[in-house]
Amino acid sequence: MTRKFLIPTENQEQRALVKWLSLHPLLKEYFYKNNNEGKRTEAQTWNLKLMGLRPGVSDLFIPYPSKTKLYAGLWLEVKRNMHYPPSARKSETWINQEIWIERMKGVGFDGHFCYGWEDGKRIIECYLSA
């Protein structure tokens, strides 16, 4: 019998990263999740857009400056820890996420895609020492 190891979902990866952040002595009070995803009716989507919903906004934001004050905060887009084919990276959603991160980098923030919660943890630890 062959055992199949499942790759955790994006939701599971983000929950694991949030759990780690919730225990972090410095950052536990300095992060939040952007509620940009989900299935909505046309009316809900329209209403949220009127309220400021923007495509591509990253999943997590840590509004805490890096050690050297080089960055004012860190934006993280959480992805599953798996290989993504080039076609997936060309989707409208992915492109909007890349645009958001580049836009934020242009105004004093840092931003990254992380592939699994452990990659997110590594990025955050590097950010804190920058």
PLM segments and residue spans:
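Catalytic phosphate/metal-binding cores of nucleic-acid and nucleotide-processing enzymes, i.e., regions
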Residues: M1-A130
